[in-house]
């Protein structure tokens, strides 16, 4: 999500990255403290004021990357409740007015319903897939779940692909979701045994 958001922001577009993985926020680790605004997404959704002014004050802007970020720093126990609330839809409605693109990072598909809930309030969805982690059957199940939302499913993005391995493993047909980040247990091969996005 952060790579896509930064690539779009380099085109001098107004881009906001929202870390909606409230269970295990990872964007703070990827982007650093400069990406943390005055308030995290969780605190913003628990408040009563979702005006454009308040939302933009809560977010952080990085002049170097031209990226606006709205992220959380610590895990939130009531993530599903906050993401399913009318406030999340209202927040997206507010930022759509000022941003050209709003990129939302969610928790892994298949482990939590967060991605399904966000697919109901987003315009489009992409499934980020990491090679050799989860079976093609699980990917198809995730696509089916996403496709039932209101957002248009745009497709999959292959992440962490090993050079030359696609052709050599075409018969194996195993790919995985680009996540992990503390959700799955590590297997002997260093791959997450569970956790999909």
Roles of regions detected by a PLM:
Residues 1-197:
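P-loop NTP-binding module
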